[in-house]
Curated annotation (Swiss-Prot):
Species of provenance: Streptomyces coelicolor (strain ATCC BAA-471 / A3(2) / M145)
Membrane topology, from the record: Multi-pass membrane protein
UniProt protein name: L-asparagine permease
PANTHER family assigned to the protein according to its UniProt record, in alphabetical order: GABA PERMEASE (PTHR43495), L-ASPARAGINE PERMEASE (PTHR43495:SF1)
Cell compartments where the protein resides: Cell membrane
One GO location term (cellular component): plasma membrane
Gene Ontology terms: biological process: amino acid transport; transmembrane transport
Annotated keywords: Amino-acid transport, Cell membrane, Membrane, Transmembrane, Transmembrane helix, Transport
Segments crossing the lipid bilayer: 38-58, 62-82, 113-133, 150-170, 175-195, 223-243, 268-288, 302-322, 357-377, 382-402, 426-446, 452-472
Length: 489
């Protein structure tokens, strides 16, 4: 990477040198309006989304009760990634998050790849979200006459408006979205535990271990289905790294981030693993479906009135939350890239309310293409973009772990200082996590229908990234030459 980028980062790590130069040119101008409660609930919201409320049904049917093990394993590695990112945040808080760290530890090419792969993840996830919102809205008969693409466009417009107002409004919206999701899960788990304890029948089935032992055991379809659902399981955890982006807009990241990151592990265990275990004990896995929330399947099985309506509203909330987070994070990431020259200049523009609206609007533009996808192939839109998004998040996590490896190596050389909040077991933890993530991509090849197509996208994306780099490298070099840190006074 350029010497200037390193110098800038080192100045940020040692503010006594000059307290006026930000660590990343893209960090300047942000408000610090996100409070501890916002970041804590953003961490929760990132761990609970449509991947659980809707996706768990189809995965439970395909993989059986062993899905809980898949969520646990992926959850542990997701925690390692966020722990590593949390350590980097405490070393140097930045709204550019891992893109800023990639710039420091991997150079401008690393930052370029990290940023655009993250944009690929969230822009395609945004398409998936507005597609999901349209599908969920069609659940109610009053909306069935409205075309899916119209509903998708309305959802995008509403969330865009919220993001353009201020970061405080974003934080409040995410706070209440998370409250709804957590309250729903807690309520369901209490009902599920009651059904289990009282042996109350669900759809004519008696809850208990018999739902597992009498229906093929933990692996009713073997190991391979569990391996194949791992891609979707990782996608379920895709917003956890949002904590690192949000840290750049908090007044006290050194107090807030460790608490938020450390709470992720037990939330994963409770909400994902606990919920899936409970679902497996309440009904045979074969009775769940990818077309219906597993929670609706259970609640409808005990005759709860309007169970489908309530859960559909919650899943709708989860999709809106994901779209909200995607616009927020890509706006900040693209601004960091624009200030370094690797993204269009207009994505670096800030509004008077300190919102990087240029990057947000670019993400929305891609989502509008998704509206077109909803118009052309409404039945396939969700599946198409989900595969692309999964590659984006896996590459982002790999880059975070590589950045942390370089960071630790420099710390051992005495070039930087590690904070007290650390990823344990380095460098083994990073290497094992990277190996796991790459293995997930490789094993997708065994899924001929979907996974193989996803893997074949890798060289296509690589060619696009290389072509894009040749298009921006001169501007990146020029920008690096312009942004030399101010001399000490």
């Amino acid at each position: 990477m350029s010497k200037d980028a390193v110098d800038t980062a080192q100045v940020a790590a040692h503010p006594q040198a000059t307290g006026t130069i930000p660590a990343d040119a893209g960090d300047a101008g942000y408000s610090k309006d996100l409070k501890a409660r916002h970041v804590n609930m953003i961490a929760i919201g990132g761990a609970i989304g449509t991947g659980l409320f809707l996706g768990a049904g189809g995965r439970l049917r395909d993989a059986g009760p062993a899905l809980a093990i898949a969520y646990l394993v992926a959850g542990v590695f997701a925690f390692f990634v966020v722990k590593a990112l949390g350590e980097l945040v405490l070393y140097r808080p930045s709204s550019g998050s891992f893109v800023s760290y990639a710039r420091e530890f991997l150079g401008e090419k690393g930052a370029y790849v990290a940023g655009w792969m993250y944009f690929l993840n969230w822009s395609t996830t945004g398409i998936a979200d507005i597609t999901a919102i349209a599908l969920y809205t069609h659940y109610w008969s009053m909306f069935t006459s409205i075309p899916q693409w119209v509903l998708a466009l309305v959802a995008l417009a509403v969330v865009l408006a919220v993001n353009l107002i201020s970061v405080k409004i974003f934080g409040e919206m995410e706070f209440w979205f998370a409250i709804v999701k957590v309250a729903t899960l807690v309520g369901f788990m209490l009902i599920g535990i009651f059904l289990l304890a009282t042996q109350h029948e669900v759809s004519g089935q008696t809850p208990g271990m018999g739902m597992i032992t009498d229906h093929g055991g933990i692996l009713p379809h073997g190991v391979m289905p569990v391996v194949l659902v791992m891609q979707g399981v990782i996608f379920s955890y895709a917003a956890l790294e949002l904590v690192g982006v949000a840290a750049g807009e908090t007044a006290e990241p050194h107090k807030i981030v460790p608490r938020a990151v450390n709470s992720i592990m037990w939330r994963v265990a409770l909400f994902y693993v606990g919920s899936v275990v409970l679902l497996a004990l309440l009904l045979p896995s074969s009775l769940y479906s990818g077309d219906e929330s597993p929670f609706v399947t259970v609640l409808s099985g005990i005759g709860v009135p309007a169970a489908g309506d309530v859960m559909n509203l919650v899943v709708l909330t989860a999709a809106m939350s994901s779209l909200n987070s995607g616009l927020y994070s890509t706006g900040r990431i693209l601004r960091s890239m624009a200030m370094a020259g690797s993204a269009p200049r207009f994505t670096g523009v800030m509004s008077r309310s300190q919102v990087p609206y240029g990057g947000i609007l670019l993400t929305c533009a891609v989502c509008v293409l998704g509206v077109g996808l909803n118009y052309l192939v409404p039945s396939k839109a969700f599946e198409i973009v989900l595969n692309v998004a999964s590659l984006g998040i896996i590459s982002t996590w790999v880059i975070i772990m590589i950045c942390h490896l370089v960071f630790v190596r420099r710390a051992r050389a005495g070039l930087v200082e590690r904070p007290g909040f650390r990823l344990p077991g380095s460098p083994v933890t990073e290497i094992v996590t990277i190996a796991f993530l790459l293995a997930v991509v490789g094993l997708m090849w065994n899924d001929e229908e979907v996974g193989r197509k996803t893997v074949l996208l890798v060289p296509v994306i690589a060619v696009m990234l290389v072509a894009g780099w040749f298009g921006v490298r001169r501007r990146v070099a020029h920008q690096a030459g312009q942004e030399r840190p101010a001399p000490r006074e």
